[in-house]
Amino acid sequence: MESTLRSGAGQPGLKLIETLRLGSSPARLALHRARMAAGAAALGWGFDAAGFDRAIQVDPQAGLRLRLTLDAAGRFEVTQGAVPDSGPQWRLSLAEARLSSTDPWLRVKTTNRATYDMARAALPAGIDEILFQNERGEVCDGSITTLFFDRGAGMHTPPLSAGLLPGVLRAELACPEETLLVADLPHVRLWVGNALRGLIPAVWRG
């Protein structure tokens, strides 16, 4: 996996991304830091943990949504904005594009995310989030969220082996992994979420 990532680590404009909410717990901030550090290691980039901590010391009055990027030269860049209103429930549908469970780029959060961005830009009317499946019909990620589900035995989440990002909220909740097929989506209780928005109840619209 790392050899594939490192061979593409020099593509122009590539950056690692962490999007976090100011005021998050130290434990959650540590998860963001650890994920960016792991991504940098996979790409063969340097990572300055103290620089990460300095970069997120910003004025919350400029917005609680903080997007931190890291480039190949080790430079951090911060942008701030308002946290989007998520609403009480999200309506879910399925993307036409499929992901490959063996694609190593799905495991690191970078600006190399055109498949996700295009799907989100083309959300159908009445849909809040689009889900992806892999080549086996297993549910992976949403375009900006992790999926969580309950068949009646407690909350679970799809396994990393399906081809998805190790989300910070996912790590924080530490739900058991379980494979979920697209055919199962109408029959389970659903949530989506990320570290910025938290956990959002969801409903399958097909």
Model-derived regions: residue spans:
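Conserved alpha/beta cores of soluble small-molecule-handling proteins
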Residues: 1-138, 152, 160-206
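Glycine- and Gly-Pro-enriched alpha-helical subdomains that act as flexible
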Residues: 141, 146-157
